[in-house]
Amino acid sequence: MGRRKSQAAAERNLEPIKISTDSIKKRPRRDSNEPPFKKFDDLEMFETYLKGESWDNDFDFLHARLDYYPPFIRNEIHDDPEKIKPTMNNKSKKFVRNLHHHVDKHLLKQINDMVGIEYKFKREEEKLPDGRLIWRYKDESDHGFEGLDRKWTVEVDVECSPNDPTVVVDMRSIPID
C-alpha cells in the first residue's frame, strides 16, 4: 500500500487486521439461525462493518449487502450520476472486464483484509435470462482453526444488470454445525 493510501486508511480506521487462533473465542450464543441483515450503499461503510464484526467475534455470522457504483465508474462520472452513459452496464465488455478486475484485485482482497482471514474464493458465473450477470464466490475451507468449534462457509455474490452500472454485493457468512 502506498503512503497516501495507508494514510487515508488510517484516518478512516480501516487498517487490515489478522485473526489468529488466540483471538478466536468460543462461538457466542445466538438467538436466531439467520444472521442479522445489514444494507450499505458505500464501500467504506461496508468495509468498516466487516472489520467491526471481526472485532466483535461475529465473522462467522453475518449477512451484508452493498449496492454501489464501482470505483472505476465513479471516477469516470466524477461522482455525478447525470454523467452515466447508456453503455455503462454488463452489456459492455469493457465494463465487465473492469468489474472483474475490481472484484478480484480489490474487493475480495479488501474483504480478506478487513475480516482478517485469508478466504480462498472459488468463482462460478451465471448469466440469467433477464440479462443480469452474477458471479458467485464461495469459500468452504476451515481457515486453519482446527480444534476450535468455529467452522463456517462464506458466499459473496456480485451482481450487475444490463440497465445501469449499479453493482450489488451480497456477502453471507454462515456457521456450520
UniProtKB/Swiss-Prot annotation:
Record's bilayer topology term: Peripheral membrane protein
Chain intervals for the UniProt region annotation (Disordered): 1-37
Cystine crosslinks: none
Record has Transmembrane as a keyword: no
UniProt cross-references to InterPro entries, sorted A to Z: RGI1 (IPR022554), RGI1_sf (IPR038235)
Source organism, top-level taxon: Eukaryota
UniProt keyword Cell membrane present: yes
UniProt xrefs under Gene3D superfamilies: Respiratory growth induced protein 1 (3.40.1000.40)
Principal place of residence: membrane
One Pfam family named in its UniProt record: RGI1
Subcellular localization, as worded in the UniProt entry: Cell membrane
Keywords of the record: Cell membrane, Membrane
Family note: Belongs to the RGI1 family.
Protein name per the record: Respiratory growth induced protein 1
Species in which this protein is naturally found: Komagataella phaffii (strain GS115 / ATCC 20864) (Yeast)
